[in-house]
Structure formats: structure tokens, C-alpha cells
């Protein structure tokens, strides 16, 4: 099988953001290959396999309402890889916050996420006014 096309990568990554926005943890986890790795944020020890990835998303998304939206177009290559800028809005330590992130993903020949690296740190976190 071939790797996803650039257009398919764009669609897959946009779908990922949609699923994060609605908090569909099971559907997010199903987007990953069985042996996938997640580095979130990049530089932390990788999380390996769907079971650990599911626990990571349950911890991160299961505690409250999280919103996510793209803040620019998905950039995709012809080798099954892509990058996207997006914003996550959440409540952190009782304070409404926004986190600006860039995710880099590599997909396998089945269109599943093989690797995901999230680029962010505390310098990308901003306090929002309560709504």
C-alpha cells in the first residue's frame, strides 16, 4: 500500500482536530497505529502503543471541556507527513487558558498516525478572559 497523499494527510489532520474539539477520545485513539508513539510535548519521553496513548488522552481531555481549532492551514508532504498549527482552549488550575501548539504527524500506509510530536511549552500558554 502507498502512504497517504498530501490531500489525505490534510484531511486526516483536520479530522484529528475535530475529534479533539468534541472530546471523542475513542475515535482519536483509533486514528493511531497499534505501535504508534506520541511525544507531547516534544522532548518528553515518548508514549508507546494505543493503550498508553489512550491513557494519555483520557488524562488530558477527560477532565473537562477542551476546545480545539486550527489556526492555520495543514501543511502536508508527499511522504505521509504533515504539520498543523492549532489552539487548545481549556481551564488550567481554575483559570481559562489557551495553548498554541504545532503538531507534526507521520502516517502509515493505512492512514493511521505512526508518530505525533506536539511542539509547545509554557511560553505558548496564555490566560483568557472568562466567558
Swiss-Prot record:
Q: State the active site.
A: 16 (proton donor), 40 (proton acceptor)
Query: What is known to happen upon mutating residue 125 to A?
Result: Slightly reduces activity and reduces protein stability
Q: What is the effect of changing residue 103 to E?
A: Slightly reduces activity. Reduces activity 10000-fold
Q: Which CDD domains match?
A: ketosteroid_isomerase
Changing residue 103 to N: reported impact? Reduces activity 4-fold. Reduces activity 10000-fold
EC number(s) recorded for this UniProt protein: 5.3.3.1
A Gene Ontology biological process in which this protein takes part is: steroid metabolic process
**Outcome of substituting residue 16 to S:** Reduces activity 20-fold
Source taxon at top rank: Bacteria
Name of this protein: Steroid Delta-isomerase
Species of provenance: Pseudomonas putida
Amino acid at each position: 500500500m502507498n502512504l497517504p497523499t498530501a490531500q489525505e494527510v490534510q484531511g486526516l489532520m483536520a479530522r484529528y482536530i475535530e475529534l479533539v474539539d468534541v472530546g471523542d477520545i475513542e475515535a482519536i485513539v483509533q486514528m493511531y497505529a497499534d505501535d504508534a508513539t506520541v511525544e507531547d510535548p516534544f522532548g518528553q519521553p515518548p508514549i508507546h502503543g494505543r493503550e498508553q496513548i489512550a491513557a494519555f488522552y483520557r488524562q488530558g481531555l477527560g477532565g473537562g471541556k477542551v476546545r480545539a481549532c486550527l489556526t492555520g492551514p495543514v501543511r502536508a508532504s508527499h511522504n505521509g507527513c504533515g504539520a498543523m498549527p492549532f489552539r487548545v482552549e481549556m481551564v488550567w488550575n481554575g483559570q481559562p487558558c489557551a495553548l498554541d501548539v504545532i503538531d507534526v504527524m507521520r502516517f502509515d500506509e493505512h492512514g493511521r498516525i505512526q508518530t505525533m510530536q506536539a511542539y509547545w511549552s509554557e511560553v505558548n500558554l496564555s490566560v483568557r478572559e472568562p466567558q
